[in-house]
């Protein structure tokens, strides 16, 4: 039996998440996995990512670093309680040595509001012994937060002009 390539392993994991396959974490991750969603709450010691803002974390409390399989399982369960992936586009996985990256988009419905959002993503992977050891997920958090926004408008000042994003 041939072993999976890194690209195949990553594609299989992402497919399992869409199916809400609860056994995926045990099959695809190293026991000491570092699973980062959009950044950490504190500065990255390696300087690769800035910390996420307190406002962003308040809006989307599942962001941050989840260490170990149990923490990843809790994150995924929390995510699945709050949103339903309703569609996804083509995915590209690039792999070299023990590192890989995946790029694509998905559409989800926020279960609390019924709103949908389409979100592009990029994921950086590090693999060890055929398992995912580091997973760094980046997405458009503004679109995600907007789908969960239950009321109120956003007032923005860009390019010297004020803009209002109404509640939908």
Residue ranges and their predicted role:
Residues 1-168:
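C-terminal and inter-domain tail/linker signature
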């Amino acid at each position: 039996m041939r072993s999976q390539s890194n690209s195949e392993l990553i594609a299989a994991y992402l497919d399992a998440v869409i199916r809400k396959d609860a056994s995926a974490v045990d099959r695809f991750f190293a026991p000491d996995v570092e699973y980062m969603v959009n950044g950490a709450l504190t500065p990255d010691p390696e300087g690769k990512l800035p910390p996420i803002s307190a406002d962003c974390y308040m809006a989307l409390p599942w962001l941050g670093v989840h260490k170990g399989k149990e923490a990843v399982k809790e994150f995924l369960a929390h995510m699945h309680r709050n949103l339903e992936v309703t569609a996804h586009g083509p995915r590209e996985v690039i792999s070299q040595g023990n590192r890989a990256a995946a790029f694509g988009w998905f559409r989800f419905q926020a279960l609390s509001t019924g709103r949908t959002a389409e979100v592009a993503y990029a994921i950086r992977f590090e693999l060890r012994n055929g398992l995912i050891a580091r997973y760094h997920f980046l997405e458009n958090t503004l679109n995600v937060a907007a789908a969960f926004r239950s009321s109120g408008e956003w007032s923005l000042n860009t390019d010297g002009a004020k803009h209002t994003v109404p509640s939908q």
